[in-house]
From Swiss-Prot:
SUPFAM superfamilies the UniProt entry points to: AlbA-like
Name of the molecule in the record: DNA/RNA-binding protein Alba
Gene3D superfamilies cross-referenced by the UniProt entry: Alba-like domain
Pfam families registered for this protein in UniProt: Alba (PF01918)
Gene Ontology MF terms in the entry: double-stranded DNA binding; RNA binding
Free-text function comment from the UniProt entry: Binds double-stranded DNA tightly but without sequence specificity. Involved in DNA compaction.
Post-translational modification: Acetylated. Acetylation at Lys-11 decreases DNA-binding affinity.
Principal place of residence: cytoplasm
Domain of life: Archaea
Length: 89
């Protein structure tokens, strides 16, 4: 899968990410991966649901992967949850 078919969800408004997903599907991508960590996990789920219900009804969940990543910081290591949602058409 090409790197351009991966959408990293962050601090921007939800609809920006929805637009990115819809644009990728309109550019003939068959699979899109939506990735998020920590507090943005709920936003990633919103992006997937808005995409499926309002813009691309024939999109299906192919895979949902949950994980815990260990990040090193100034105060030692911390565990951060992450999600990868794969949508296909």
């Amino acid at each position: 899968m090409a790197e351009e078919n991966i959408i990293f969800v962050g601090k921007k408004p939800t609809m920006n990410y929805v637009l990115a997903v819809v644009t990728q599907f309109n550019n003939n991508a068959n699979k899109i991966i939506i990735k998020a960590r920590g507090k943005t996990i709920s936003k990633a789920v919103d992006v997937a649901e808005i995409t499926r219900h309002k813009f691309i009804p024939d999109a299906k969940y192919e895979e949902i992967r949950l994980d815990t990543e260990t990040l090193q910081g100034e105060r030692g290591s911390s565990n951060v949850s992450s999600i990868e949602i794969t949508l296909s058409r």
